């Protein structure tokens, strides 16, 4: 591998270093940028409730990779979301999130499982927001199972598993909204997410014409870590989310990585099934 006139010998050790580089960058970002952006939990403009929907996950060329299903059950001001994708190659991604919605959205717990050939590194992450306990189970480069468990001081705006919910309540006329997220690198690191509205775009559903608000969700990495990420091409890609506005906002589509270091995938509402 050649870079700027220097010759590097590509070895297994170098491969392991390159794989771990995104984790190092995020770790630096957490230290350098932990207090750079003020953040607060998103206010509840419309309460969540009972829901059962179907999704499709595709690559950007339109090939279907997985079928998805999302359910939502509310008990009082406590809501549980369960999102699952079943891939054609047998892989599974599941995210179960519980949160409260008394004036502001507050994460209570989040449990994510990703396994199968669609994921380079199988991983299971559990977050207990009340105690700050974060547990990550994963396999290292040699295939050995590892467990990391630590307490993290989680802010009220931690948003793991809540992105599709929060964007429906973000004010589209606010220049940007900042929330926090625990990134499993695999060591748990607290980072910031910027949610920036990009304006409205036309949306057609058959003969019906609507407008959807386009949001960009960006992982904020500043300082030296951000510069290194840019130079080395390791800057986390933006996630794009489209939300149907009005009195009953609804998720329409997203384009972004489903997991750290993953490819850009498109998630959108599935068409009606056949009876």
Question: What are the residue ranges of the model-derived segments?
Answer:
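Bacterial N-terminal signal peptides that target proteins for export
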Residues: 6-25
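C-terminal segment of classical bacterial N-terminal signal peptides
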Residues: 28-37
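Surface-exposed beta-loop interaction hotspot
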Residues: 139-175
């Amino acid at each position: 591998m050649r870079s700027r006139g220097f010759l590097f010998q590509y070895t297994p050790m170098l491969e392991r270093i390159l794989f771990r580089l995104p984790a190092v960058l995020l770790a630096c970002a957490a230290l350098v940028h932990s207090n750079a952006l003020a953040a607060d939990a998103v206010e509840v403009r419309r309460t969540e409730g009972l829901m059962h929907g179907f999704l499709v996950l595709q690559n950007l060329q339109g090939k279907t990779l997985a079928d998805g299903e999302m359910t939502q059950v509310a008990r009082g001001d406590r809501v549980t979301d369960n999102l699952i994708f079943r891939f054609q190659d047998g892989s599974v991604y599941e995210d179960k999130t519980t949160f409260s919605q008394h004036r502001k959205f507050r994460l209570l717990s989040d449990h994510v499982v990703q396994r199968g050939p669609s994921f380079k590194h199988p991983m299971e992450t559990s977050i207990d927001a009340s105690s700050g306990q974060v547990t990550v189970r994963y396999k290292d480069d040699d295939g050995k199972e590892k467990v990391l468990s630590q307490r993290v001081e989680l802010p009220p705006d931690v948003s793991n598993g809540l992105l599709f919910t929060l964007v429906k309540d973000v004010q589209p006329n606010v220049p940007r909204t900042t929330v926090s997220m625990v990134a499993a690198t695999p060591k748990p690191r607290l980072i910031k997410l910027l949610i920036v509205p990009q304006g409205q775009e036309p949306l057609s559903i058959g003969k019906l014409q609507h407008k959807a608000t386009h949001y960009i969700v960006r992982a904020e990495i500043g300082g030296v870590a951000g510069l290194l990420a840019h130079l080395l091409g390791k800057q986390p890609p933006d996630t794009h989310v489209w939300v149907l506005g009005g009195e009953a906002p609804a998720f329409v589509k997203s384009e972004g990585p489903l997991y750290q270091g993953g490819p850009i995938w498109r998630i959108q509402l599935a068409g009606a099934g056949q009876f």
